[in-house]
Amino acid sequence: MLIKMLTKVFGSRNDRTLRRMRKVVNIINGMEPAMEKLSDDELKAKTAEFRARLEKGETLESLIPEAFAVVREASKRVFGMRHFDVQLLGGMVLNDRCIAEMRTGEGKTLTATLPAYLNALTGKGVHVVTVNDYLAQRDAENNRPLFEFLGMTVGINMSGLPAPAKREAYAADITYGTNNEYGFDYLRDNMAFSPEERVQRKLHYALVDEVDSILIDEARTPLIISGPAEDSSEMYRKVNKIIPHLIRQEKEDSDTFTGEGHFSVDEKARQVNLTERGLVLIEELLVQEGIMDEGESLYSPTNIMLMHHVTAALRAHALFTRDVDYIVKDGEVIIVDEHTGRTMQGRRWSDGLHQAVEAKEGVEIQNENQTLASITFQNYFRLYEKLAGMTGTADTEAFEFSSIYKLDTVVVPTNRPMIRKDMADLVYMTEAEKIQAIIEDIKTRTAAGQPVLVGTISIEKSEVVSRELTKAGIKHNVLNAKFHASEADIVAQAGYPSAVTIATNMAGRGTDIMLGGSWQAEVAALENPTPEQIEKIKADWQVRHDAVLAAGGLHIIGTERHESRRIDNQLRGRAGRQGDAGSSRFYLSMEDALMRIFASDRVSGMMRKLGMKPGEAIEHPWVTKAIANAQRKVESRNFDIRKQLLEYDDVANDQRRAIYTQRNELLDVSDVSETINSIREDVFKATIDAHIPPQSLEEMWDIEGLQERLKNDFDLDLPIKEWLDKEPELHEETLRERILQSAVETYQRKEEVVGAEMMRHFEKGVMLQTLDSLWKEHLAAMDYLRQGIHLRGYAQKDPKQEYKRESFSMFAAMLESLKYEVISTLSKVQVRMPEEVEAMEQQRREEAERLAQMQQLSHQSDDEAAAQDLAAQTGERKVGRNDPCPCGSGKKYKQCHGRLS
């Protein structure tokens, strides 16, 4: 109450920000007459003038009025479009490291030109971030003439571009690209083996379009660059055959472990758990299939990987639905983004889930992957010196933007008052009743000439509505992940009189729906349109535009509520742009996912009290409030998940930053010999300490163990025992010095053979490769630690603190391993003289010729012997990377002979 009274007196924070910025808008407007008098060349020269002023110490903030006035004037000359005052406000908000909430149709693309130009004056580069390649290319090409008129360069960063083209795009003053591509380029740059392979500059200013989609909806999705792991596709197929024998437990709230079914599903947490009956049955089936031995338990340590396969297969069958969570196209499982309804080509689920879905659908199972590098969008975008974003719907998530990204949200007023009519929700008992009511509403509105946009939350739902419309004989367009290519064209013409368009979530975001259709699209379809043809198209469009306005503008129908109010608002926001007429309504049923999981009991109770009959809908403020509360509950839960993910990822992020900084320093120097000499001392000190404890008696020395260790790990064959026998005065300190000196001399002899330059190059390569290999293993270990850390809570320990503590210990151990493995590899490298290499090469050629002759003979001999040979070869067991090495050293294969292969 007190806060409301204070807001009335002093205005809200938003009002105060806008009031301050309106003073600057007045200054910009006052400069307009002077700018209009400048010639084109004088206007262009302003860019060089601004840059010179910045170099002399002026700030960007002091340049805002003049720079914005220059961009506005250039836009009038190049596009014939003048920035509205509200767009100038939006530009200032974006320059202020804030998020600008600007309604659909208010010209966000043109608004972005203002802060992009201003921040590009520094010469450090501006990254404009969009949600897909189409929008990046469209916005770059649309704005290129304006920026080039002002002497700025524009680059487009698309996926699949070669490194030189990417480098050129990043070198431009203003670069357009997608969030994924910027993030992957950052990871790839930190895996480069030479400075020339890197493409990005220092991250300066990011201007994120559809910022809610990228920083909130995608925040839980890490960007991962992965390499192939061991092939286990056959196991996925075998386990997949077993799952259909299991029965789902009907009662969600019954005890997970003692229920009637074989597994229970927690839809809120998206988890699947086996019941005791299910565990018994699945163990029997695994034994029958020969996957597990009789008497073994699925939970025994030897069956951990098998348990992983069973869980993945259960989740694939119980939680993931075709045409909702993914589609199958050209024999490939492609993920569908739950927030936008778009397909995510190239993205794969982790933890074996994608392979389990491939097995379920009977398509080719691709190898599991091992993470080589990863980062979340939350941490990637926080690397920028300056970050800002714009969207039509940010206010509901303002707290999250502020707490995670330190970005304030400013709601920019519309250029014209909003007159869209948002009607109350209608709730039906069943899905079928709801669909029928939607069809009737569409019939009524299209008969009056009103265009209708139907928003669905999945491909499956969009196809259900489409089938019903076809039965009713209503012409319509379907816009979902399956028809991605025609997206912009369908959206542009969705405002035609009586047009019906079905769109999954907000496919088509970024393209305005023009009432009466898009006359520009019609002109673009003609090869060489004459001025008369263009005028006729415009006149026809004006007639259609007026007819649609008279019919009530664009009508939005939501087929169910989304988990987030923001995404519902995005759908509503497609109508009523720039002060146009429009209306919206959501149709719900008690069978909708949100209602079933979060709001069913309260709303069902209300419906029973009101005595609902089939086909009747309930429309009541109580119901709307109950639904809004359910959405808040989900939003709050999702925010907690994202915040928790960030807290855990922050631990990995600190380590990532340290490794990448170290790696970049390593890349930028050509000589790492000083570092090598320093870590050689550390490694030999630690190795000797393990066998000769400091300040210990000779009886405690393990000389044989030390000799063996030096021989195996550093290829140093030193007669330490003889030294001690022959030289009684040889004490611990001089012995240490002699061993280290021997190692240095051996290494120097190798260097003399190959030359200092070659050795420096080799040292740098070994350091980079070892660092990458250990970092990859560390990421996998961190992942395993993260998955099980919540169990520490049962021991009254804080899982987050435990995770921080253990991951730090693992990181420290990794750095020690890095030192050891680098010195070990460099010590063991064999250097050959040129004549030795030539002799070995000659021997290899002779051996190859002999084998070729033998193969020719074997082709003429009988096939049975060849088949037996093949059987013998294929019967050999493949040694896994983490298995003991067959040589008997006791080491893991990857650390022994596996390294040689």
UniProtKB/Swiss-Prot annotation:
Localization terms from the record: Cell inner membrane; Cytoplasm
Membrane spanning stretches: none
Organism domain of life: Bacteria
Chief location category: membrane
Family annotation (Pfam families): P-loop_SecA (PF21090), SEC-C (PF02810), SecA_DEAD (PF07517), SecA_PP_bind (PF01043), SecA_SW (PF07516)
Gene Ontology BP annotations: intracellular protein transmembrane transport; protein import; protein targeting; protein transport by the Sec complex
Catalytic activity, as annotated: ATP + H2O + cellular proteinSide 1 = ADP + phosphate + cellular proteinSide 2
Subunit description: Monomer and homodimer. Part of the essential Sec protein translocation apparatus which comprises SecA, SecYEG and auxiliary proteins SecDF-YajC and YidC.
Name of the protein in its database record: Protein translocase subunit SecA
Organism the protein comes from: Klebsiella pneumoniae subsp. pneumoniae (strain ATCC 700721 / MGH 78578)
